[in-house]
């Protein structure tokens, strides 16, 4: 089986990750003790992708829970799934990273990293045929961003040919926890550009908007936001976990989605989003589902795809849907909005269909877009970064951990390069010889 090793780092990563395990345990019929109570063989057919089978038919998530302080771990342990995870896979420090990227990446995190890598090796050795790794973390804090990127870099060295995916929560301007978020996020993106194959960008602001506007929740809390994230994560990983007519694994997704190795930051979306009360009153046709999937209001990151163009898109449908109708609707969407798709990548929309819908849905769709509009998200962080870095504000927190200002400048220019690469591919037409004229002067 193509196994995945799941890692979650920091407070945000552990909360989102735990919610994800709740969601997929429900889908696979695994209760909180790890016993199977499902009603369909399909639930067990590819269960090895995420679970190890322990003694007495108990299923144990192949998950590592990592944090630099014990608090979040304790709440996961006492939560609904506390007994499900393997006790040895809780790896935590005592000091905390204090929202400081340098502590997570260079000092505190570096002390814990060997312990984490030992558990990673143990999990990988038990695999039949390891497909890759996925990491849940946020980019605004200290542990998820600093230690998370350190972990990715280390695993990349040791398993260079395995796919590396991250679900990264990008800090948003309206929902901010700490002043140094722009620093932490920029330093993290600097690492992610080089070290991951696919990064799904999730944004608290977009999640709040969905809760307010679409789900009509008067005061959404973090568990509502995490529920949305877990729906999306479950959708993205559907085709790995269930047999369907079109199965794609993470590597196929990467091949279809990443036209240039640096541009691997995706905007995920989910449909149908309806408030819990009105859900049962709506029947969702494929037409409606497709329309919703491409709607900016359903995107989990705060950028508007209509401000840019899609390089590639993957659409995953779940439920009893007709393949032909799915293909027709997607084609229709593409022809009607052809200006929003770059014309130099023909058939750049990939569809996958899985027969098993998520819990509580008849049909559902997950959307993954590689759009040039995501530069809005990076530009926002970059502007905040520059404003603070120009004044060298808060820099002593980082330099006292042994970081150099040089590293900040590098991260800043790498982020700006990324933004201009997206911009460049947004503007290029089918007949522009972009590569040739740039390559000429080097001779």
Curated annotation (Swiss-Prot):
Quaternary structure annotation from Swiss-Prot or TrEMBL: Dimer of alpha and beta chains. A typical microtubule is a hollow water-filled tube with an outer diameter of 25 nm and an inner diameter of 15 nM. Alpha-beta heterodimers associate head-to-tail to form protofilaments running lengthwise along the microtubule wall with the beta-tubulin subunit facing the microtubule plus end conferring a structural polarity. Microtubules usually have 13 protofilaments but different protofilament numbers can be found in some organisms and specialized cells.
Function in brief: Tubulin is the major constituent of microtubules, a cylinder consisting of laterally associated linear protofilaments composed of alpha- and beta-tubulin heterodimers. Microtubules grow by the addition of GTP-tubulin dimers to the microtubule end, where a stabilizing cap forms. Below the cap, tubulin dimers are in GDP-bound state, owing to GTPase activity of alpha-tubulin.
Domain of life the protein comes from: Eukaryota
PROSITE patterns: TUBULIN, TUBULIN_B_AUTOREG
GO molecular function terms attached to this record: GTP binding; GTPase activity; metal ion binding; structural constituent of cytoskeleton
Designated name of the protein: Tubulin beta-3 chain
UniProt-annotated location(s): Cytoplasm, Cytoskeleton
SUPFAM superfamilies reported in the protein's UniProt record: Tubulin C-terminal domain-like (SSF55307), Tubulin nucleotide-binding domain-like (SSF52490)
Main location: cytoplasm
Pfam family, one: Tubulin
UniProt keyword Metal-binding present: yes
PANTHER family cross-referenced by the UniProt entry: TUBULIN
Family named by the database record: Belongs to the tubulin family.
GO cellular component: cytoplasm; microtubule
An individual GO BP term: microtubule-based process
UniProt entry keywords in alphabetical sequence: Cytoplasm, Cytoskeleton, GTP-binding, Magnesium, Metal-binding, Microtubule, Nucleotide-binding
Residue numbers binding Mg(2+): 69
Listed cofactors: Mg(2+)
Protein residues bound to GTP: 11, 69, 138, 142-144, 204, 226
InterPro entries membership: Beta-tubulin_BS, Beta_tubulin, Tub_FtsZ_C, Tubulin, Tubulin/FtsZ-like_C, Tubulin/FtsZ_2-layer-sand-dom, Tubulin/FtsZ_GTPase_sf, Tubulin_C
């Amino acid at each position: 089986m193509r196994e995945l090793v799941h890692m979650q780092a920091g407070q945000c990563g552990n909360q989102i990750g735990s919610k994800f395990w709740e969601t997929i345990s429900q889908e696979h019929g695994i209760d909180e003790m790890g016993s199977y109570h499902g009603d369909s063989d399909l639930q067990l057919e590819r269960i090895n992708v995420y679970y190890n089978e322990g003694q007495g038919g108990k299923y144990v998530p192949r998950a590592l829970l990592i944090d630099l302080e014990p608090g979040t771990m304790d709440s996961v342990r006492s939560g609904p799934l506390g007994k499900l995870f393997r006790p040895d896979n809780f790896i935590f420090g005592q000091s905390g990273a204090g929202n400081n990227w340098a502590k997570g990446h260079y000092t505190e995190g570096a002390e814990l990293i060997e312990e984490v890598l030992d558990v990673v090796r143990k999990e990988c050795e038990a695999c039949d045929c390891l497909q890759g790794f996925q990491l849940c973390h946020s980019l605004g804090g200290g542990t998820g961003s600093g230690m998370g990127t350190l972990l990715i870099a280390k695993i990349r060295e040791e398993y260079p040919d395995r796919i590396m995916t991250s679900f990264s929560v990008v800090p948003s301007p309206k929902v901010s926890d700490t002043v140094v978020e722009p620093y932490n996020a920029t330093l993290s993106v600097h690492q992610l550009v080089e070290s991951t194959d696919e990064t799904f960008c999730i944004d608290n602001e977009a999640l709040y908007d969905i809760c307010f506007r679409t789900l009509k929740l008067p005061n959404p809390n973090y568990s509502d936001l995490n529920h949305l994230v877990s729906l999306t994560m479950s959708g993205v990983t559907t085709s790995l976990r269930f047999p369907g007519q079109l199965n794609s694994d993470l590597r196929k997704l990467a091949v279809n989605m990443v036209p240039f190795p640096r541009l691997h930051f995706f905007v995920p979306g989910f449909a149908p989003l309806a408030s819990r009360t009105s859900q049962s009153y709506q029947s969702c046709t494929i037409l409606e589902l497709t329309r919703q999937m491409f709607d900016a209001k359903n995107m989990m990151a705060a950028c508007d795809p209509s401000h840019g163009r899609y390089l590639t898109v993957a659409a995953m449908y779940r439920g009893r849907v007709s393949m032909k109708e799915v293909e027709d609707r997607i084609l229709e969407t593409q022809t009607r909005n052809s200006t929003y798709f770059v014309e130099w990548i023909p058939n750049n929309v990939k569809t996958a269909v899985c027969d098993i819908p998520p819990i509580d849905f008849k049909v559902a769709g997950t959307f993954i877009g590689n759009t040039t509009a995501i530069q809005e998200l990076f530009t926002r962080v970059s502007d905040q970064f520059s404003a603070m870095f120009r004044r060298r504000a808060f820099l002593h927190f980082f330099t006292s951990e042994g970081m150099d200002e040089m590293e900040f400048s590098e991260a800043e220019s790498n982020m700006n390069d990324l933004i201009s690469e997206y911009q460049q591919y947004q503007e290029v037409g089918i007949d522009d010889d972009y590569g040739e004229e740039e390559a000429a002067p080097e001779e």
